[in-house]
Amino acid sequence: MADRIYWTLEQAQDLFNKPFLELMFEAQQIHRQHFDPRQVQVSTLLSIKTGSCPEDCKYCPQSSRYRTGIDTERLMQVEQVLDSARQAKAAGSTRFCMGAAWKNPHERDMPYLEQMVQGVKAMGMETCMTLGMLHHDQAERLASAGLDFYNHNLDTSPEFYGSIITTRTYQERLDTLDKVRGAGIKVCSGGIVGLGETVRDRAGLLVQLANLPTPPESVPINMLVKVKGTPLADNEDVDPFDFIRTIAVARIMMPASYVRLSAGREQMSEQTQAMCFMAGANSIFYGCKLLTTPNPKEDKDLALFLKLGLNPQQTGTEFGDNQQQQRLAEQLINADSEQFYNAAV
């Protein structure tokens, strides 16, 4: 794009330092230039393989290095995953994300992963996976199966990264994103607020994301979910205004990307979530959990949507179509969501 901005750290920090209301106004203006401000993309995330991850990410309850009480589960059978996808679609999701606690996928598991992608695609849903690092041929195989998105977060700035993770380098994360993009899969990549980072680190993360050769189509911004047994369990709470600022700056720096209000929503007030939508967030995960951490139930999300006049994207509804919203509400309330998970990684 001829008019694309390549951001400096100083420019990003200047955005964080703007008066709050000015920042919100700018973010909302930019959001309206690229998106319908009343539509929110809705995804569901399922943990298809839980626990026993060899990585040492200090925030993650699925690491084998920490005692967090997480039950370890092997890779789910394909039909189990497809059953969950059917329920997610019935509950209103348009994208089904599948996450596995691996450093990288094993070759023996690739045929099953391909079948999962093909099966979910056949339902008319978008597909996303987060499986750790990928080799070139693995990315190509997932692309051939029809995978739409691959999630691989950068987590934080390059400077702070080594304080949080030592078993995978920042460059390895960037290399995986490059392989995903090279295979023709859309990129989902973001980070976490509340790791103990500074505002400069938050700015540095967003600079890394915005200055990728092609910015991510989807940018999940997570609030740290503190889990007992992880090294970050006693971190200070994130000030809601600091989190909202991060959403707003992400929207300004990546105007055409979906900015996902991701992990941590269970601990946010409705008012904080509303301000995040005002700041430019236009995607959420919903379901009972995000991987292994709590997430607001679907009926609670829908009630908030109704209060704010928001519509789940691609529901075939016109603005204010209360009958359609009521039908969706009934689907959400009746859906069995116990196996759906909330994504922090």
UniProtKB/Swiss-Prot annotation:
Coiled-coil spans in chain: none
Binding-site list for [4Fe-4S] cluster: C53, C57, C60
PANTHER family hit by this protein: BIOTIN SYNTHASE, BIOTIN SYNTHASE, MITOCHONDRIAL
Organism phylogeny: Bacteria, Pseudomonadati, Pseudomonadota, Gammaproteobacteria, Enterobacterales
Membrane-crossing segments per the record: none
Entry-linked SMART domains: BATS, Elp3
Matching CDD domains: Radical_SAM
Annotated protein name in UniProt: Biotin synthase
Pfam families: BATS, Radical_SAM
Purpose: Catalyzes the conversion of dethiobiotin (DTB) to biotin by the insertion of a sulfur atom into dethiobiotin via a radical-based mechanism.
Database matches in SUPFAM superfamilies: Radical SAM enzymes (SSF102114)
The entry's keywords: 2Fe-2S, 4Fe-4S, Biotin biosynthesis, Iron, Iron-sulfur, Metal-binding, S-adenosyl-L-methionine, Transferase
Molecular-function annotations in GO: 2 iron, 2 sulfur cluster binding; 4 iron, 4 sulfur cluster binding; biotin synthase activity; iron ion binding
Catalytic activity from the UniProt record: (4R,5S)-dethiobiotin + (sulfur carrier)-SH + 2 reduced [2Fe-2S]-[ferredoxin] + 2 S-adenosyl-L-methionine = (sulfur carrier)-H + biotin + 2 5'-deoxyadenosine + 2 L-methionine + 2 oxidized [2Fe-2S]-[ferredoxin]
Organism the protein comes from: Pectobacterium atrosepticum (strain SCRI 1043 / ATCC BAA-672)
A biological-process GO annotation: biotin biosynthetic process
Cofactor annotation: [4Fe-4S] cluster; [2Fe-2S] cluster
Radical SAM core domain boundaries: 38-256
Similarity-based family: Belongs to the radical SAM superfamily. Biotin synthase family.
Pathway given in the UniProt record: Cofactor biosynthesis; biotin biosynthesis; biotin from 7,8-diaminononanoate: step 2/2
Listed PROSITE patterns: RADICAL_SAM
EC identifiers of the protein: 2.8.1.6
Subunit structure of this chain's protein: Homodimer.
Cofactor binding, note field: Binds 1 [4Fe-4S] cluster. The cluster is coordinated with 3 cysteines and an exchangeable S-adenosyl-L-methionine. Binds 1 [2Fe-2S] cluster. The cluster is coordinated with 3 cysteines and 1 arginine.
Residues that bind [2Fe-2S] cluster: C97, C128, C188, R260
